């Protein structure tokens, strides 16, 4: 199977202006993400799907491949679907967010390989165990509920599964884990992705603001790769400063 990593990159950002172009350690955030993606052992190609010529110029400056996509794309998934239309020979497309410069290539590989191992699945993604009460209860920490054989039952911002009798230490520390933090990295089968991009947002998706629920509502199969930890993304100036400090300390 042929795999391609696509990094959807949008210039505008509500909380941190043009964050993908910010420099840390002599490289842009976008270049750091691109170079991390290149370390994947499963992808034959890495492409950045951009919405602005300035991002395309940045990708060109560090020798990467950029594809200019429509400004009308409503999400990164839509940008990846546009790239999928250009590459009929690709079987699996992997979505790596442009603002995750510390993404672990092993996580990328684990997600792609899991999709290959499950021909019945449409999407693969990742999650790490949660042992911290605050994260379980934090709506900004998206939880994945897992069934047998890596299947995702649902995703939610709520504390799910909900502990009727209270969240005890026994529930938090159980093995296998009861609580999983979803990691927003996806591998899609090309035919599924092209279908998905034509579908309107689902009812649950609109309530939770979680795009993956569109697939769950439609009865599609999502498999989840368990990984050790999630990579910190860059959403705020504080996130960027922390990333810069880590880069400069290396």
Curated annotation (Swiss-Prot):
Location of the protein in the cell: Cytoplasm
Pathway: Nucleotide-sugar biosynthesis; CMP-3-deoxy-D-manno-octulosonate biosynthesis; CMP-3-deoxy-D-manno-octulosonate from 3-deoxy-D-manno-octulosonate and CTP: step 1/1; Bacterial outer membrane biogenesis; lipopolysaccharide biosynthesis
Keywords: Cytoplasm, Lipopolysaccharide biosynthesis, Nucleotidyltransferase, Transferase
SUPFAM superfamilies: Nucleotide-diphospho-sugar transferases
Gene3D superfamilies: Spore Coat Polysaccharide Biosynthesis Protein SpsA, Chain A
Statement: the UniProt record of this protein carries the keyword Nucleotidyltransferase: yes
GO cellular component assignments: cytosol
Pfam families on file: CTP_transf_3
Role according to the record: Activates KDO (a required 8-carbon sugar) for incorporation into bacterial lipopolysaccharide in Gram-negative bacteria.
Family, similarity comment: Belongs to the KdsB family.
The protein's name in its UniProt record: 3-deoxy-manno-octulosonate cytidylyltransferase
Organism: Rhodopirellula baltica (strain DSM 10527 / NCIMB 13988 / SH1)
């Amino acid at each position: 199977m042929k795999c391609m990593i696509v990094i959807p990159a949008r210039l505008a950002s509500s909380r941190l202006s043009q964050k993908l172009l910010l420099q840390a350690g002599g490289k842009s955030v976008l270049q750091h993400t691109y170079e991390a993606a290149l370390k994947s052992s499963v992808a034959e190609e890495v492409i950045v799907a951009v919405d602005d010529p300035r991002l395309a110029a940045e990708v060109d400056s560090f020798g990467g491949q950029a594809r200019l996509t429509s400004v009308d794309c409503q999400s990164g998934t839509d940008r990846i679907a546009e790239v999928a239309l250009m590459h009929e020979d690709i079987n699996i497309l992997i979505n790596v967010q442009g603002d995750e410069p510390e993404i672990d290539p092993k996580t990328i590989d684990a997600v792609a390989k899991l999709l290959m191992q499950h021909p019945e699945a449409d999407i693969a993604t990742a999650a790490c165990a949660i042992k911290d009460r605050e994260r379980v209860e934090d709506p900004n920490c998206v939880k994945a509920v897992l069934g047998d054989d890596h299947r995702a039952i649902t995703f939610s911002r709520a504390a799910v599964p909900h502990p009727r009798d209270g969240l005890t230490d026994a529930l938090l520390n159980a093995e296998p884990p009861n609580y999983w933090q979803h990691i927003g990295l996806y591998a899609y089968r090309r035919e599924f992705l092209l279908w998905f991009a034509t579908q309107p947002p689902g009812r649950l998706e609109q309530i939770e603001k979680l795009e993956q629920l569109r697939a769950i509502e439609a009865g599609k199969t999502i498999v989840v790769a368990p990984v050790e930890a999630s990579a910190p993304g860059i959403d705020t100036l504080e996130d960027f400063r922390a990333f810069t400090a880590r880069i400069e300390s290396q």
